[in-house]
Amino acid sequence: MSELSTMAIKAGGQLAPDFMLWIGSKDVTPNLRERMVSLSLTDNRGFEADTLSITLDDSDGLLQLPQRGTVVSLFLGWVGQLHNKGDYTVDQVSHSGAPDVLTITARSVDFRGELNKARDVSYHDATLGSIVTQIAQRCGLILQMAEGFAGIKIDHIDQTHETDPSFVTRLAKRYGAAAIIKAGRLLFLRPGSGELASGKAIPTVLLTRQQGDKHNFMVADRTSYKGVQAKWLSTQEAKTHIFQMQRKAKAPNAAAVTHPDAKSPPKQAYDNEGEYTAGQKESLLVLPEVFDSKEAAKQAAEAKWSEIQRGVVHFTFQLATGRADLYPETPVQVSGFKTVIDASAWIISKVTHNLSVKDGFTTTLELEIDISDVEYEEIN
């Protein structure tokens, strides 16, 4: 068996990783601490459930298999600095060997009940807020919706043999939102805004390259566009109009701090850093659907444009010393990387915490470009 409290910290610190697990009102940590092989927690954005995976040493054969549906509460961090990471419902149990280990998988959302029921519902002359409110009430969830979504008018939309999670995800994607279930709440927020559903700004976190073990930065030009076009039909004129949204040209960024071992590229490589993640000049994405109003076309174009901008650049960063306090939508500023990386504002889109005897406590961040302060122009 293993003693988790003696794990070394890669960064050379003296802190010891720690965790606490509760089942109902019972603290089961003392029974599991010496059996802990590894613990992984993935904190997702969107309707994809957060996933907790626990692997325990069962070489003596004394562990009992937990019942599916059991609710587990996790606290994670360092000795004296634990963070409440929420409740998870056990939905998968596996036992393998030799050596014998028990692996328990639990998720933040229990999809076995009403959430997994396919429905046939028509919504007519409604608003986005009223529709999402109905869904939250059906699922027994408290709705928190970011400003700007509730009043959006929807003439008609059908939910045809579709589960509520699938339907609300479709709605969120269409109107540039993200639908998330956390702690009994349905959050309908604007991804990449750096704000909570309440509208409160999340403080920016500063991270340096020296805090990490690994990183990966990639620009995918095949998904890069100058703008998005959406067509809408004017019934009064019997004419199709085009609404186009594109990014305004941005002045080059000031030079950022670079890693001491990094080689300086030629000066011309920095000339257009302000447009480094922008699309090609003549590349436009045309939406195939013809919308029934200019407002609907605008909303669809804005949503698709935001989605594209967030997907152009991929940046992952593994922190050698785990940060249980970090969560999706947190704004991040980094330093010590290439200039174009340091000069960009980032938003956390996914967090994976790993705790093991072998590697200690690490946190891997998936980040995307923060587009909340990017300026756009409309072309009609």
Language-model segments: residues:
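Short glycine/serine/proline-enriched coil/turn segments at secondary-structure junctions
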Residues: Q81-L82, S96-A98, I180, L187, ...
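Short beta-strand-centered interaction patches in the first periplasmic/extracellular domains
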Residues: S2-A8, V101-D110, E147-R222
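Amphipathic, non-transmembrane alpha-helical segments in extracytoplasmic/periplasmic proteins
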Residues: S53-I54, A106, D120-Q144, Q159-K182, ...
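Assembly/oligomerization scaffold segments
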Residues: M1-G113
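An acidic/polar, Gly/Ser/Thr-rich interaction patch typically located in mid-to-C-terminal regions
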Residues: R35, L39-Q67, Q211-N380
